[in-house]
């Protein structure tokens, strides 16, 4: 991963409270896993930045290298990598995701 892509990813994560690196956009997810996380965040009424990793091969590989996590989507809250689809869905079902949002001061339903 080039330093430019790593810096770009770090800036996005640092400058936004909640970021979802995903395939597609929140208005038009391009895979079922991204769609599931979008639906979860929408259900919780969380404001977040979506980043379409399909726009660039370098970004698509770069985000995987950035976290050393092989799959997309990837959710960040206040600069902390939280996880991918299965983790987010499990955290939502258990109430842990709401607790993380509360702890980090993120507004949600």
Task: Label the predicted regions.
Residues 77-108:
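Non-catalytic, surface beta->alpha helical segment in thiol-disulfide oxidoreductase systems
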Residues 7, 60-65:
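TIR-domain catalytic/interaction hotspot
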Residues 42-62:
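Thiol-based oxidoreductase modules, predominantly thioredoxin-like and allied folds used
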């Amino acid at each position: 991963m080039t330093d430019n892509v790593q810096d770009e990813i770090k800036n996005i994560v640092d400058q936004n409270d909640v970021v979802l690196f995903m395939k597609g956009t929140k208005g038009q997810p391009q895979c079922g896993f991204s769609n599931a996380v979008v639906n979860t965040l929408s259900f919780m009424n969380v404001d977040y930045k979506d980043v379409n990793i399909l726009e660039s091969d370098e970004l698509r590989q770069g985000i995987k290298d950035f976290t050393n996590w092989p799959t997309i989507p990837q959710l960040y809250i206040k600069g902390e990598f939280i996880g991918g689809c299965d983790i987010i869905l499990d955290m939502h079902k258990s109430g842990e995701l709401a607790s993380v949002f509360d702890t980090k001061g993120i507004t949600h339903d």
